[in-house]
């Protein structure tokens, strides 16, 4: 019987301690120093999306389509609002006047890793009801396709 695959339980998120303003190879991602931003609550999907452009002509019954601009993604990442060195670094990266890009890595409990690089904006501070925890939400403006390392390769 096949397994169910990895869940997000036990995973972590970390940001590079230095700016990374140029596209990175996997070996360059691996060569950076990261600090964990603890208490990740949820993260949006990552990966490249690409516009599909169309051109309608009188003589074609079906429009012509082509690939347009690609976007590295703009996922939100939400954390419990608790003090830590990682949160301090993330807040500094998100400052409105900090235009640097940073590398980040999602790591799953099975050892799989996904590396991304981009801008950090925010935070937005959630409110909610009586029994909700304080959370902060940041948006990552990713600048290149992710580099994925499967668990067997780590």
Language model: regions and residue ranges:
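Solvent-exposed edge beta-strands and adjacent loop segments
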Residues: 1-78, 121-132
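Residues that flank catalytic or metal-binding motifs in active/ligand-binding sites
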Residues: 9, 73, 100, 116, ...
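Short, positively charged, low-complexity/disordered linker segments
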Residues: 21, 26, 30-37, 92-111
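Structured, beta-strand-rich domain cores
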Residues: 62-109
């Amino acid at each position: 019987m096949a397994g169910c695959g990895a869940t997000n339980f036990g995973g972590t998120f970390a940001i590079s301690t230095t700016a990374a303003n140029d596209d990175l190879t996997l070996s360059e991602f691996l060569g950076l120093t990261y600090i964990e931003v603890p208490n990740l609550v949820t993260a949006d999907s990552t990966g490249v999306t690409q516009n599909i452009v169309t051109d309608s002509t009188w003589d074609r019954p079906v429009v012509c389509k082509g690939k347009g601009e690609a976007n590295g993604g703009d996922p939100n990442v939400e954390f419990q609002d608790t003090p830590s060195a990682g949160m301090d670094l993330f807040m500094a990266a998100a400052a409105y006047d900090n235009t640097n890009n940073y590398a980040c890595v999602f790591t799953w409990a099975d050892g799989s890793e996904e590396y991304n690089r981009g801008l950090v904006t925010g935070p937005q501070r959630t409110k909610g009801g009586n029994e909700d925890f304080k959370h902060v939400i940041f948006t990552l403006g990713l600048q290149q396709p992710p580099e994925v390392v499967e668990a067997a390769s780590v």
